[in-house]
């Protein structure tokens, strides 16, 4: 595949491998990051059971890691200053913490400005306040859980995050401070917001992300659903090794218990680092003991059902974490090797060579203004202006310096809005302005081909997609349980 910009190298996965924490302010403009990389899904839950709907259902309304990703806030209004003169009051109690009216109104103002800058409809104020209050409650519950779990964020951690944000925006730290001041956000408050994001990111990683696994069977099913030559990596063959502690058919309960105890002792030795093959040669009662217990490569359908179920999702070198019982006795199992039978090294995938021009929307550029600019630029390109020169001059994507070139891309690498519009174009044709969560794009298809893509790369891609889906589902379940277990007392009507 052709060399790509940093943006598109990141976009080879359909979603980020990690989404960091809840934002303590709904921030506005995407000033850095991959223009085509699908943003993290919103991480909110409505009240106690259902995912939050409305203003937070799209990625850029409440981005999951806006501060750490490099997003800077838009300009503030005078309402916050005027509000500081008002007497504050508690609107909700979350376990032992409180949420104040000033905090609620400030956050609602920020979300409202965000939506306006993106040319999106702003909900009725009462609905907006209700959703924002639920978001603040979720943030409180997570922060409390993180602190109770002993998770801490040092000043040095925050310093590194500040430096990273500045670098992503091509700013020095002092310039970043100036930008924050212009937006009306105090630097100390910005640091605390960053600290909160890091705290919640670490909590999520420990409680959710690190516990999610993707199994080979899931990858096979995913690829099969995609169809085509990439549907599967072939029939899997497994080489399983066993240590058998035999049990006679007429063995007493005591004899069976003793055999199980011996097998469990052998399993503990293996888990402790003992050489499996040596233990098999010394202790196994199976015919293949002299070969280190290895049964040899065979399709999973030719393995005993108990063995197949136990090893199907293991990686080579892993040991089944419990003793398996069969009519022959008790087995300690290890997956020695797994490979696809007769698998082609590569498979054909339809690829598109594409380039684009991006204009980002934000507080200084509405979607309508961006659309008008791109429409005028498209007219010039259609009448002879070089697309690459236009991209270098006007595009705000990291691919601009390469004339907007994204190289050869495979299905699923780019965000759906972009990919759908790209699929309708003929080579050489330039799209009308296309909107995504990153802004508006002009897209030009340069060519199409059937490419040989390594099967292992397809499987890596499938793994990342499946993991992202499972992580998101697990996170939503975990967050819902966390919310349900919290004691929340509303001091005012949430719709006020």
Curated annotation (Swiss-Prot):
<keyword id="KW-0697">Rotamase</keyword>
<dbReference type="InterPro" id="IPR046357">
    <property type="entry name" value="PPIase_dom_sf"/>
</dbReference>
<dbReference type="GO" id="GO:0050821">
    <property type="term" value="P:protein stabilization"/>
</dbReference>
<feature type="domain" description="PpiC 2">
    <location>
        <begin position="349"/>
        <end position="447"/>
    </location>
</feature>
<dbReference type="GO" id="GO:0043165">
    <property type="term" value="P:Gram-negative-bacterium-type cell outer membrane assembly"/>
</dbReference>
<dbReference type="Pfam" id="PF00639">
    <property type="entry name" value="Rotamase"/>
</dbReference>
<dbReference type="InterPro" id="IPR050280">
    <property type="entry name" value="OMP_Chaperone_SurA"/>
</dbReference>
<feature type="region of interest" description="Disordered">
    <location>
        <begin position="53"/>
        <end position="80"/>
    </location>
</feature>
<dbReference type="InterPro" id="IPR023058">
    <property type="entry name" value="PPIase_PpiC_CS"/>
</dbReference>
<keyword id="KW-0143">Chaperone</keyword>
<keyword id="KW-0574">Periplasm</keyword>
<dbReference type="GO" id="GO:0006457">
    <property type="term" value="P:protein folding"/>
</dbReference>
<dbReference type="GO" id="GO:0051082">
    <property type="term" value="F:unfolded protein binding"/>
</dbReference>
<dbReference type="InterPro" id="IPR000297">
    <property type="entry name" value="PPIase_PpiC"/>
</dbReference>
<dbReference type="Pfam" id="PF13616">
    <property type="entry name" value="Rotamase_3"/>
</dbReference>
<feature type="domain" description="PpiC 1">
    <location>
        <begin position="235"/>
        <end position="337"/>
    </location>
</feature>
<dbReference type="GO" id="GO:0030288">
    <property type="term" value="C:outer membrane-bounded periplasmic space"/>
</dbReference>
<dbReference type="GO" id="GO:0042277">
    <property type="term" value="F:peptide binding"/>
</dbReference>
<keyword id="KW-0413">Isomerase</keyword>
<keyword id="KW-0677">Repeat</keyword>
<comment type="function">
    <text>Chaperone involved in the correct folding and assembly of outer membrane proteins. Recognizes specific patterns of aromatic residues and the orientation of their side chains, which are found more frequently in integral outer membrane proteins. May act in both early periplasmic and late outer membrane-associated steps of protein maturation.</text>
</comment>
<dbReference type="Pfam" id="PF09312">
    <property type="entry name" value="SurA_N"/>
</dbReference>
<feature type="signal peptide">
    <location>
        <begin position="1"/>
        <end position="42"/>
    </location>
</feature>
<dbReference type="InterPro" id="IPR015391">
    <property type="entry name" value="SurA_N"/>
</dbReference>
<dbReference type="InterPro" id="IPR023034">
    <property type="entry name" value="PPIase_SurA"/>
</dbReference>
<protein>
    <recommendedName>
        <fullName>Chaperone SurA</fullName>
        <ecNumber>5.2.1.8</ecNumber>
    </recommendedName>
</protein>
<keyword id="KW-0732">Signal</keyword>
<dbReference type="GO" id="GO:0003755">
    <property type="term" value="F:peptidyl-prolyl cis-trans isomerase activity"/>
</dbReference>
<dbReference type="InterPro" id="IPR027304">
    <property type="entry name" value="Trigger_fact/SurA_dom_sf"/>
</dbReference>
């Amino acid at each position: 595949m052709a060399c790509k910009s940093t943006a598109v190298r990141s976009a080879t996965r359909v979603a980020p491998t990690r989404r960091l924490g809840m934002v303590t302010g709904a921030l506005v403009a995407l000033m850095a990051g991959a223009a085509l990389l699908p943003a993290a899904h919103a991480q909110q839950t409505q009240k106690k059971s259902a995912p939050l709907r409305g203003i937070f259902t799209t990625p850029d309304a409440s981005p999951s890691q806006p501060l750490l990703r490099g997003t800077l806030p838009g300009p503030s209004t005078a309402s916050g200053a005027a509000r500081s003169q008002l007497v504050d009051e508690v609107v909700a109690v979350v376990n032992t913490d409180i949420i104040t009216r000033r905090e609620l109104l400030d956050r609602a103002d920020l979300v409202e400005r965000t939506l306006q800058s993106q040319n999106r409809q702003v909900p009725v104020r009462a609905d907006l306040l209700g959703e924002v209050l639920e978001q603040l409650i979720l943030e409180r519950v997570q922060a409390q859980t993180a602190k109770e779990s002993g998770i801490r964020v040092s000043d040095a951690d925050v310093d590194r995050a500040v430096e990273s944000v500045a670098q992503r925006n091509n700013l020095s730290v002092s310039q970043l401070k100036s930008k924050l001041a212009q937006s009306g956000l105090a630097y100390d408050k910005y640091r605390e917001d960053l600290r909160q994001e890091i705290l919640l990111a670490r909590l999520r990683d420990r409680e959710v992300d690190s516990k999610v696994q993707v199994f080979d069977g899931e990858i096979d099913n995913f690829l099969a659903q995609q169809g085509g030559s990439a549907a599967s990596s072939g029939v899997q063959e497994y080489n399983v090794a066993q240590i058998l502690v035999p049990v006679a058919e007429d063995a007493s309960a005591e004899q069976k218990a003793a055999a199980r105890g011996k097998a469990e002792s052998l399993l503990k030795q293996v888990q402790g680092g003992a050489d499996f093959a040596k233990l098999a040669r010394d202790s196994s009662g199976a015919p293949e003991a002299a070969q280190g217990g290895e049964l040899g490569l065979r399709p999973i359908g030719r393995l005993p059902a108990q063995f197949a179920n136990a090893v199907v999702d293991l990686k080579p070198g892993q040991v089944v974490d419990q003793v398996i019982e069969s009519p022959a006795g008790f087995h300690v199992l290890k997956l020695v090797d797994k490979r696809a039978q007769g698998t082609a090294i590569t498979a054909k995938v339809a690829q598109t060579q594409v380039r684009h021009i991006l204009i980002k929307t934000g507080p200084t550029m509405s979607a309508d203004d961006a659309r008008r600019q791109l429409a005028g630029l498209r007219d010039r390109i259609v009448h002879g202006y070089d697309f690459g020169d236009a991209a270098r001059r006007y595009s705000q994507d990291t691919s601009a310096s390469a004339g907007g070139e994204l190289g050869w891309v495979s299905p699923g690498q780019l965000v759906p809005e972009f990919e759908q519009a790209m699929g309708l174009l003929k080579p050489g044709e330039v799209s009308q302005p296309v909107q995504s969560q990153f802004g508006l794009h002009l897209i030009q298809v340069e060519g199409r081909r059937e490419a040989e893509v390594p099967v292992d790369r397809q499987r890596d891609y499938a793994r990342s997609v499946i993991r992202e889906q499972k992580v998101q589902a697990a996170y939503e379940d975990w967050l819902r349980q966390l919310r349900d277990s919290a004691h929340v007392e509303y001091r005012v009507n949430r719709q006020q």
